[in-house]
A protein has these predicted regions:
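N-terminal nicking endonuclease/strand-transfer module with a His-rich metal-binding environment
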Residues: 1-151
């Protein structure tokens, strides 16, 4: 259900990925949310955090896709609850934007997280500990909706 996508090291990474994720053709219901940023200015605000802490090199963001099987039935409200919960998980330290894409046979959520902490500038590492922590959180959230984690 979750898929990491891409390396985002160039200066246009924030703008390119966020523009793709929030494309109105893919998000006709406007199901876009975020934490620690204004969704209309997410790319600029993420870039500003990286600039303030002089962390403009290496991978700039995490782009994760949470995809639901066409066999799984889940209402839009449930998808948004799961996306909100995942955004909340990272919100203590990071800026997060999500967008629910409805342009395919199955809905999916694009999550974009600034790898630079807005609080103190530390960089998200994506360690095994972090991976298993978010995985456990996601499994718990999915169970609330009668879904399961498929990876």
């Amino acid at each position: 259900m979750i898929n990491q996508a891409g390396k985002f090291q160039d200066s246009s990474a924030y703008d390119d990925v966020i523009r793709y994720c929030t494309n109105p053709d893919k998000t006709p219901s406007g199901l876009i949310g975020g934490r620690n940023l204004d969704t209309d200015y997410a790319a600029e605000q993420m870039e500003t955090v990286a600039d303030v802490f002089d962390k403009n090199s290496k991978t700039r963001l995490e782009h994760t896709v949470l995809s639901f099987s066409p066999k799984e039935e889940i209402a839009q409200a449930g998808i948004v609850e799961i996306a909100d919960s995942l955004a909340d998980y990272y919100a203590k330290d990071y800026q997060v934007l999500y967008a629910v894409h409805e342009n395919t046979d199955h809905p999916h959520v694009h999550m974009v997280m600034n790898r630079i902490s807005y609080r103190d500038g530390h960089r998200y590492r994506g360690s095994k500990r972090e991976y298993y922590g978010v995985r456990a959180h996601l499994k718990k959230e999915l169970r609330k909706h009668g879904l399961h984690l498929d990876y």
